[in-house]
Curated annotation (Swiss-Prot):
This is Xyloglucan galactosyltransferase XLT2. It is a single-pass type II membrane protein. Functions in xyloglucan synthesis by adding side chains to the xylosylated glucan backbone. Involved in galactosylating hemicellulose xyloglucan (XyG) at the second position of the XXXG motif to form XLXG. Associates with other xyloglucan-synthesizing enzymes to form multiprotein complexes for xyloglucan synthesis in the Golgi. Residues 1-49 are cytoplasmic. The keyword Glycoprotein applies. The chain crosses the membrane at residues 50-70. Belongs to the glycosyltransferase 47 family. Glycans are attached at N250, N288, N377, N449. The gene is XLT2. One of its GO terms (biological process) is xyloglucan biosynthetic process. Its EC number is 2.4.1.-. One of its GO terms (cellular component) is Golgi membrane. Interacts with CSLC4, FUT1, XXT2 and XXT5.
Length: 517
């Protein structure tokens, strides 16, 4: 627990004698003067006692008021500073735990209305050394071995405005569309959580503690070329060392802490030095921390899948409603579609099989071949294809999930899955419990061996079935996108809100029945 530095209280109260000092003896020879002297002295004693009593009571009251006032003020915890070297250069960073000042991000302060809206809990954001977030962003030119990431990480992580989509989407929504990179959830979550109405500056009142470390961006620059395992692990080791020195981590052993890791979980699960990725999740200290990832390990309780960022970032509720109306009324002339690229050199490549299957479907399927264009962060061709199709095929990507799942659903197209781990076992906080209410599942093995035709399966759905499923997909849109407004939407809960609510719910449940020690 962070020690509160109470002001020095007085070591002792000011003490006054209850009786006056001894005086000269009374002259007994003059009884009148003697009686008069005694009377004066009695009055003096009574007055002195009264004044002393009021003085003591006043001091006690003042001390009580001062104690109660100062007790409510969070004071920074201080401990022995540690110095961490920057991966880019030898930089000395003094590590101290400080409470973020309200002026730094102007979080909503406590009020009766906000108290009512924060029944689920409050979140405290660690003020970490900048080497864990800001410095990483400042090195955006070096985060990718092939090109600069600066444009992709600009604009609070939303990227450049997608003005070229003006011929595809309603003009009044163009300002809500961006060329958003799929690996920027760390930036988006950090900016939003600093402005969250339930953020607290008092760690004693926190239900959850957020670690604003950009783990995915930090490791991304070391995933390729000839970097050693130590390079890929460096940032995460520094982070866990810092966090484990925080008193609130030590109080719970990390079970009420959470972090956003903006890549798939497998980028942080290296078992051997020669394997891919970092070993961040396996570093001591990470075991009990809840991790928000765009792809989770379905067998790890502490991994939570959150939606990939899409290009749509609504500014208000009206943006959401207008987009829902647009995709609901869109004329769809194609039964199904597929956007992707085959993987050369992979035996029985399923994506290549789907491309061939589409080509053989005689106008029922539309494709976007991503071998000849950039598809990872969306394009007008992909958006138009999804907007014009009833169903969109969603095989696994390089891992079990793809950003395309969310691009597809955002366009009001019904996803068709071939792996249950692509969505059903990934995004339980965001998708309905009944998968068939919004999606179709087809056994990939039956497609591969030719016993099942995708076209025939999808043609069995009536127009009314398709309408109901599409309506369910459209209803989900607010929960799958990240709002542009730093304070979120007015009444809709976006993906960030759903994630934070889930974290609060999980921590309250864990506190009752489940702690790893």
């Amino acid at each position: 627990m962070l020690p509160v530095s109470n002001p020095s209280s007085p070591e002792h109260l000011l003490k006054k004698s209850r009786t006056p000092d001894s005086t000269t003896s009374i002259d007994r020879k003059n009884s009148f003067n003697s009686l008069h002297s005694v009377g004066n002295r009695s009055s003096y004693i009574a007055a002195s006692r009264s004044h002393c009593t009021w003085l003591i009571l006043s001091l006690l009251s003042l001390q009580l008021i001062l104690f109660l006032t100062l007790r409510s003020i969070p004071f920074p915890h201080r401990h022995i500073p540690e110095n961490f070297p920057s991966p880019a250069a030898v930089v000395t960073t003094t590590v101290t735990t400080t409470v973020i000042s309200a002026a730094s991000s102007n979080p909503p302060l406590s009020s009766s209305s906000s108290d009512e809206r924060c029944d689920s809990g409050r979140v405290f954001v660690y003020d970490m050394p900048k080497i864990f977030n800001e410095v990483i962003l400042q090195q955006c030119d070096n985060l990718n071995p092939w090109s600069s990431r600066c444009d992709a990480l600009s604009n609070d992580g939303f990227g450049q405005e997608a003005t070229s989509l003006s011929n595809v989407i309603p003009k009044d929504l163009v300002q809500s569309w961006f060329w958003t990179d799929q690996f920027v959830t760390e930036i988006i979550f950090h900016n939003r959580i600093l402005n969250h109405r339930c953020r607290t500056l008092d760690p004693e009142s926190a239900t959850a503690f957020y670690i604003p470390f950009y783990a995915g961006l930090a490791v991304g620059q070391y995933l390729w070329s000839n970097y050693a395992a130590a390079d890929r692990d460096r940032h995460c080791k520094m982070m866990t060392q810092w966090v484990k020195n925080q008193p609130y981590w030590n109080r719970s052993n990390g079970w009420d802490h959470f972090i956003t890791m903006g890549r798939i979980t497998w980028d942080f699960r290296r078992s051997k030095d020669e394997d891919w990725g970092s070993n961040c999740i396996y570093i001591p200290g990470m075991r009990n921390i809840t991790r928000l990832l765009i792809e989770r390990n379905s067998w790890d309780h502490f991994d939570v899948g959150v939606p990939y960022p899409t290009g749509f970032h609504p500014r208000s509720d009206s943006d959401v409603v207008n987009w829902q109306d647009f995709v609901r009324n869109r004329r769809r002339e194609t039964l199904f579609c597929f956007a992707g690229a085959p993987r050369a050199g992979i035996v029985n490549d399923f994506r290549g099989l789907l491309l061939r299957h589409c080509e053989e479907s005689r106008g029922k399927c539309r494709t976007v071949d991503c071998t000849v264009g950039k598809c990872s962060n969306g394009s007008s061709a992909i958006l138009e294809t999804f907007l014009g199709s009833d169903f969109c095929l969603q095989p696994r990507g390089d891992s079990f999930t793809r950003r395309s799942i969310f691009d597809c659903m955002l366009a009001g197209s019904i996803p068709v899955f071939f792996w249950r781990r692509s969505a059903y076992m990934q995004y339980q906080w965001f998708l309905p419990d009944k998968p068939d209410s919004y999606s179709v599942f087809i056994d990939r093995n039956e497609v591969t061996n030719g016993t099942t035709s995708i076209k025939e399966v999808l043609e069995r759905y009536s127009k009314e079935d398709v309408r109901k499923m599409r309506e369910r997909v459209i209803d989900l849109i607010p929960n799958l996108v990240y709002a542009k407004s730093p304070n979120g939407l007015e009444t809709f809960k976006d993906a960030f809100d759903v994630a934070i609510d889930g974290v609060f719910r999980r921590f309250k449940e864990q506190e009752k029945w489940y702690k790893w020690r």
